[in-house]
Curated annotation (Swiss-Prot):
Entry's family note: Belongs to the TRAFAC class translation factor GTPase superfamily. Classic translation factor GTPase family. PrfC subfamily.
Gene3D superfamilies: P-loop containing nucleotide triphosphate hydrolases, Peptide chain release factor 3, domain III
Pfam families given in the database record: EF-G_D2, GTP_EFTU, RF3_C
Gene: prfC
Chain coiled-coil ranges: none
InterPro entries in the record: EF-G-like_DII (IPR053905), EFG_III/V (IPR035647), G_TR_CS (IPR031157), P-loop_NTPase (IPR027417), PrfC (IPR004548), RF3_C (IPR032090), RF3_dom_3_sf (IPR038467), RF3_GTP-bd (IPR041732)
Localization in the cell: Cytoplasm
CDD domains the record matches: RF3 (cd04169), RF3_II (cd03689), RF3_III (cd16259)
Reported function: Increases the formation of ribosomal termination complexes and stimulates activities of RF-1 and RF-2. It binds guanine nucleotides and has strong preference for UGA stop codons. It may interact directly with the ribosome. The stimulation of RF-1 and RF-2 is significantly reduced by GTP and GDP, but not by GMP.
GO biological process, one term: regulation of translational termination
Ranges for domain tr-type G: 8-277
GO molecular function, one term: translation release factor activity, codon specific
Protein name as annotated: Peptide chain release factor 3
Organism: Actinobacillus pleuropneumoniae serotype 3 (strain JL03)
Cellular component, GO, one term: cytosol
Length: 526
């Protein structure tokens, strides 16, 4: 197959949802339909307890939530689909944001009993930054749901995106009978499939067919016809250009748990979602059709293989083809490296990649030299932009139970901060170690991983820090004066960047007023 054909058949997407909307179930069912796993919801390990394929960290196993982002590749409809799993728990980290910089489209999963929830709103704001095309799956039709028309209205008004229903539900809960495909004029009748059973779906042609009345009952058939008249009058038709621009979302109804409707949105994804897209660098735009290799690191994850103390850097291939043993330029450090053992992912199963194309995600073994945001090329000096680092909103001082392990603690914290799991600050005036996070759960993750991966027992204490900003200044003399007068508020982060840590927002505002020549940054490019 030629290079353009390989690139054109790739689709790279992430699933976004509020916790408990059914994202983990959908992820499994997508893999099931892609024949990538045999039993949904399980990797039967030696302990024979089932763990979802994409949840591999110890704490995730205990809590049943997907904290880290994994990558899964599977074939579907003559396409190769890369699914990036994003954390679905109550408070998520920058990992989620950064993962969304590595995809070309997203599937938004909504719990049809609840409608649009707060996390979904937050994630949609992130996809807006790059006008990412969005498909929508209204989940849990096997339960009692809100009025479907009301759900569409809510998505339109709250998320500011037009809805184009592709399928329409017939009943819900115990009365759920299936969905009607508007463009194809076909009804797909619901039979619950459990676990890894995908039922053969019975299809009824035509909305006026007596077979439809016989299958779902006169009342529901008539209700469907009435609702469709309303829908066709009140909602939008699917418009591919508006979808690609992130202005309109095709909407599918189904139940992931009942293995129903998942294939409809997969068909939509492979048919409509964009092939790998161009990306901006600080020098020029790189097109996916270019044959020279380039890519950027959007995530670093430690210890994916408990048997090996390794760290893997996840790289999105932007252009060209990766081949085993190829020489690439690691732009930030200006060094050429030979990559002979990159990984491809089927969650939990890591295979060595012989080749990878634009749109694919590969894993590079990292011994501390690779950072989030790093660019790799075949020689060209450029840096991909738009991979953010956010100023944390929560801070704690971290302290050792055994003071002799200070070295391991620092090593662990710096590695976890390079991974983006948390940020670490070392104040200039003392030997404290302050941990900053975007969400509370990150603190638990850090303590649990320090214990299991670095054999360090640590505890947190309250610390008088309300917020942090990265500081820079073009005038060296003024910067020195600022540093001299504010030493008690300055710290170095994990990458040795100077940071202003403020005990209150008032303190920060005063500092910004007092030093107009100093730039205080809330986000920083990696």
């Amino acid at each position: 197959m030629s290079y353009p054909q390989e690139v054109n058949k790739r689709r790279t997407f992430a699933i976004i949802s509020h916790p408990d909307a059914g994202k983990t179930t959908i992820t499994e069912k997508v893999l099931l339909y892609g024949n990538a796993i045999q039993t949904a919801g399980s990797v039967k390990g030696k302990g024979s307890s089932a763990h979802a394929k994409s949840d591999w960290m110890e704490m995730e196993k205990q809590r049943g939530i997907s904290i880290t982002t994994s990558v899964m590749q599977f074939p579907y409809n003559n396409c190769l689909v890369n699914l990036l799993d994003t954390p679905g728990h109550e408070d998520f980290s920058e990992d989620t944001y950064r993962t969304l910089t590595a995809v070309d489209s997203c599937l938004m999963v909504i719990d049809s009993a609840k409608g649009v929830e707060e996390r979904t709103i937050k994630l949609m704001e992130v996809t807006r930054l790059r006008d990412t095309p969005i498909l929508t799956f209204m989940n849990k039709l096997d339960r009692d749901i809100r009025d479907p028309m009301e759900l569409l209205d809510e998505v339109e008004s709250v998320l500011k995106i037009r809805c184009a229903p592709i399928t329409w539900p017939i009943g819900c809960g115990k009365l759920f009978k299936g969905v009607y495909h508007i463009a194809k004029d076909e009804t797909y009748l619901y039979q619950s499939g459990q676990g890894s059973t995908i039922q053969e779906v019975r299809i009824v042609k035509g909305l006026s067919s007596p077979e439809l009345d016989a299958a779902v009952g006169d009342d529901l058939a008539n209700q469907l016809r009435e609702e469709l008249e309303l829908v066709q009058g009140a909602s939008n038709e699917f418009d591919h250009e508006a979808f690609i621009n992130g202005e309109l979302t095709p909407v599918f109804f189904g139940t992931a748990l009942g293995n129903f409707g998942v294939d409809h949105f997969l068909d939509g994804l492979t048919e409509w979602a964009p092939k790998p897209q161009a990306r901006q660098t600080d020098v020029r735009t790189v097109e996916s059709s270019e044959e020279k290799f380039s890519g950027f690191v959007f995530k670093i994850q430690a210890n994916m293989d408990p048997k090996h103390r390794d760290r893997v850097a996840f790289m999105r291939v932007v252009s060209g083809k990766y081949e085993k043993g190829m020489k690439l330029k690691h732009v930030r450090i200006g060094k050429d490296v030979v990559i002979s053992d990159a990984l491809t992912f089927m969650a939990g199963d890591r295979a060595h990649a012989e080749e990878a194309y634009a749109g694919d995600i590969i894993g590079l073994h990292n011994h501390g030299t690779i950072q989030i945001g790093d660019t790799f090329t075949q020689g060209e000096v450029m840096k991909f932009t738009g991979i953010p680092n956010f100023a944390p909103e929560l801070f704690r001082r971290i302290r050792l139970k055994d003071p002799l392990k200070q070295k391991q603690l620092l090593k662990g914290l710096v590695q976890l901060s390079e991974e983006g799991a948390v940020q670490v600050f070392r104040p200039l005036m003392n030997n404290d170690l302050i941990v900053g996070a975007v969400g509370v759960l990150q603190f638990d993750v850090v303590v649990s991983r320090l214990k299991t991966e670095y054999n360090v027992e640590a505890i947190y204490e309250a610390v008088n820090v309300a917020t942090a900003r990265w500081v820079e200044c073009g005038d060296a003399k003024k910067f020195e004066e600022f540093k001299r007068k504010n030493e008690q508020n300055l710290a170095l982060d994990g990458g040795d960047n100077l940071t202003y840590i403020a005990p209150t927002m008032v303190n920060l505002n005063l500092a910004q007023e007092r030093y107009p020549d100093i730039n205080f940054f809330k986000t920083r490019e990696h």
